[in-house]
């Protein structure tokens, strides 16, 4: 009778492949678990809602920001050593409708 040969499993790349895959899945699961555990849900208690209402009342009395306190933006043009323009942000109102039709301003180009 012949002796049975020993099978050395670690000479094959398969255990390393599955081991690495297992570690990767474990790492992803731990990351997701930590995200779920640290996610803060807003509390729905009546005490907190009452405090939020008081904060909203104070916001109505707030003064609008004057123009001198608005942030100024410096625009440096190419080739200039000093800033040449100061820009002030402008609030643009949203359009009244999503689809604007400029049918009156159609220009016909003849070829």
Curated annotation (Swiss-Prot):
Q: Where is the composition biased (Polar residues)?
A: 40-49
Stretches in topological domain Extracellular: 1-16
Chain positions of motif VIMAG: 75-79
Give the Cytoplasmic membrane side ranges: 38-111
Subcellular compartments: Membrane
Membrane topology label: Single-pass membrane protein
Transmembrane segments annotated in the record for this chain: 17-37
Per the record, its GO cellular-component terms are: membrane
Organ and tissue specificity: Expressed in the vascular tissues.
What InterPro entries would the database entry show? Answer: GDU (IPR040359)
Instruction: List the residue ranges of the region (Disordered).
Output: 40-63
Q: What does this protein do?
A: Probable subunit of an amino acid transporter involved in the regulation of the amino acid metabolism. Stimulates amino acid export by activating nonselective amino acid facilitators.
Domains as described in the record: The VIMAG motif is necessary for the function of the protein.
- What other note does the entry give for this protein? Overexpression of GLUTAMINE DUMPER 6 leads to free amino acid levels accumulation and plant size decrease.
According to UniProt, the name of this protein is: Protein GLUTAMINE DUMPER 6
């Amino acid at each position: 009778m012949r002796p049975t040969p020993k099978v050395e499993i670690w000479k094959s790349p398969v255990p390393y492949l599955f081991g690495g895959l297992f570690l990767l899945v474990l790492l992803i699961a731990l990351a997701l678990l930590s995200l779920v555990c640290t996610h803060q849900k807003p509390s729905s208690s009546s005490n907190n809602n009452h405090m939020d209402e008081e904060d909203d009342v104070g916001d109505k009395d707030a003064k609008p920001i004057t123009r001198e306190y608005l942030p100024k933006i410096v625009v440096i043009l190419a080739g200039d050593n000093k800033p040449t323009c100061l820009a002030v942000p402008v609030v643009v109102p949203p359009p009244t409708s999503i689809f604007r039709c400029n049918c009156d301003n159609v220009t016909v180009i003849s070829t």
